[in-house]
């Protein structure tokens, strides 16, 4: 199986690639290190994979994903043509969007329409979800764009809530919130969703 990850810019060093290579040696890891187009910013370059002429499912992951426990189940999660699998974002307070952009699995040919839609007006889509208040900038919104677009033609599936969580190593990741309270509430929500006391 092919797995793709984006590492553009200097926020994440080569040690992130090394980590994923060590964790996923039996997979075909592919790196997107340069923008596919000079207008396309950072994680929005994930859209490129949707344009590939492949008849097999692929995975695309965030470069900073941590893989623990029986993590290979994530990559082997079942999918059929016409489906799109994503990581749930259950920890958000606003539940109007359900996915997190840290993991997608799909058939690229099924998603070509999403790539075409994005490329038809790159500037509009890269700012749309920031301007309408769904997320904050300067660069964000790709997971919201993907979720809205997937729902136009595909069946959206999420992996089990108990397989994923969000963990922040410092308070900068959750601007405007009390860090300790956020961690506490997230832990309680996880326990409730998974019955994992």
Which ranges hold each PLM region?
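N-terminal anchoring/stem segment of glycosyltransferases
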Residues: 1-43, 54-55, 108-109, 153, ...
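Short aromatic/hydrophobic "clamp" motif used to bind/position activated sugar donors
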Residues: 58
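Substrate-binding rim/cap in mid-to-C-terminal beta-strand-loop elements of soluble/periplasmic
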Residues: 95, 99-109
């Amino acid at each position: 199986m092919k797995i793709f990850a984006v590492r553009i810019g200097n926020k994440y060093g080569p040690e992130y690639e090394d980590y994923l290579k060590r964790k996923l040696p039996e997979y075909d890891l592919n790196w997107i290190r340069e923008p596919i187009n000079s207008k396309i910013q950072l994680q929005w370059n994930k859209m490129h994979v949707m344009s590939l002429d492949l008849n097999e499912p692929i995975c695309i992951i965030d470069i900073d994903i941590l893989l623990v426990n029986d993590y290979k189940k994530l990559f082997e999660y079942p999918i059929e043509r016409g489906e799109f699998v994503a990581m749930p974002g259950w920890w958000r307070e606003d539940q109007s969007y359900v996915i997190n952009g840290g993991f997608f699995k799909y058939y690229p040919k099924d998603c070509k329409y999403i790539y075409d839609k994005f490329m038809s007006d790159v500037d509009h889509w890269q700012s749309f979800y920031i301007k309408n208040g769904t997320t904050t900038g300067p660069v964000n919104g790709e997971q919201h764009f993907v979720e809205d677009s997937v729902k136009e033609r595909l069946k959206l599936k999420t992996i089990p809530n108990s397989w994923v969580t969000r963990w922040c190593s410092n308070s900068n990741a959750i601007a405007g919130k009390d860090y300790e309270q956020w961690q506490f509430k997230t832990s309680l929500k996880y326990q409730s969703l998974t019955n994992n006391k």
